[in-house]
Amino acid sequence: MPSYTLHYFNHRGRARSAVCCSQLLVSSTMTADRVFRMGQHEKQDAMSHDANVGIGQQNPNSPEYAMARYLAREFGFHGRNNMEMARVDFISDCFYDILDDYMRMYQDGNCRMMFQRSRDMSSSSEKRMRFQETCRRILPFMERTLEMYNGGSQYFMGDQMTMADMMCYCALENPLMEEPSMLSSYPKLMALRNRVMNHSKMSSYLQRRCRTDF
């Protein structure tokens, strides 16, 4: 059984789904995790500011979502057969679309995070409208998709938590901090996020993780 060290930043960004996947793995497989603060990793191993941080000693250019998929497949959170895997993928992709459009609102022209609203109000407004439209398009579909298994009272794949459920939690975490009523019309999704948050291994991670503004 291989072991891994997961490197990630102390912000709730695109790699958070990979971090959440890691918290559900048996303890013997995850040897350690290493949290970088912004500006710290550029001094490590001659990495540039824009470099992605990969898994262990593998290619450091692996995208963060690929890391989440890899961990989910490796340890059984990606569905039990090809049809389930396809379902987990399209649900995860939908939530990633929401997360990606949200993160774009905080990126400058070079795709670097600003962690503050853009001073270019026209650009910021256009990006926010895009994010809101993505939510209007995807959230009703995700609510209906969740209801297809056991009326939406468990997880997207029934009684088994998968990467799709973790993506629901991670992708909506920051948007809900800005707009707490965002899921008021989607009670099944809100209840699902609470189930993920209260999962025994997830809750312990959420309690001990670094508190950040973003």
From Swiss-Prot:
Residue ranges of domain GST C-terminal in the record: 81-214
SUPFAM superfamilies, alphabetized: GST C-terminal domain-like
Expression tissues: Lens.
Coiled-coil region(s): none
Record-annotated GST N-terminal domain positions: 2-79
GO biological process: glutathione metabolic process
UniProt-recorded Gene Ontology molecular function terms: glutathione transferase activity; structural constituent of eye lens
One Pfam family in the UniProt entry: GST_C_3
Keyword field: Eye lens protein
Role of this protein: S-crystallins are structural components of squids and octopi eye lens. Contains relatively little GST activity (1/1000 of that of mammalian GST enzyme).
Family affiliation: Belongs to the GST superfamily.
Name the UniProt record assigns to this protein: S-crystallin 1
Species, as recorded: Octopus vulgaris (Common octopus)
Lineage: Eukaryota, Metazoa, Spiralia, Lophotrochozoa, Mollusca
